[in-house]
Amino acid sequence: MKKRFISVCAIAIALLVSLTPAALAADLANGAKVFSGNCAACHMGGGNVVMANKTLKKEALEQFGMYSEDAIIYQVQHGKNAMPAFAGRLTDEQIQDVAAYVLDQAAKGWAG
């Protein structure tokens, strides 16, 4: 009985691990699309045309306490200063996807 339970758990974990990259890729692809249509005008290539020091580059996100999905989601939902709020314009899923995309790009240095 114990062996069977361990086998079932091992199979379940293997399935979850194998599915994660595909799900993440789909989120990043949607995040890229949402970013392109809603964010790129001000944040092309991870920059910031309004406030040059507050970019989406990893170092700036870390410096300003924004290097987490939760922080980016809050900022996108509520806006700040010249950045408009996107809650109501974008779905929660779109906002989550764009946050994941921003973090992914920041980790890659916005190299693509």
Swiss-Prot record:
Residues 1-25 form the signal peptide. One of its GO terms (biological process) is photosynthesis. It is found in: Cellular thylakoid lumen. SUPFAM superfamilies: Cytochrome c (SSF46626). Heme c binds at residues 39, 42-43, 83. Keywords: Electron transport, Heme, Iron, Metal-binding, Photosynthesis, Signal, Thylakoid, Transport. Coiled coil: none annotated. Transmembrane segments: none annotated. One of its GO terms (molecular function) is electron transfer activity. Binds 1 heme c group covalently per subunit. One of its GO terms (cellular component) is plasma membrane-derived thylakoid lumen. Its main location: other. InterPro entries: Cyt_c-like_dom (IPR009056), Cyt_c-like_dom_sf (IPR036909), Cyt_C6 (IPR023655), Cyt_C_IC (IPR008168). Functions as an electron carrier between membrane-bound cytochrome b6-f and photosystem I in oxygenic photosynthesis. Belongs to the cytochrome c family. PetJ subfamily. Monomer. This is Cytochrome c6. It comes from Thermosynechococcus vestitus (strain NIES-2133 / IAM M-273 / BP-1). The gene is petJ.
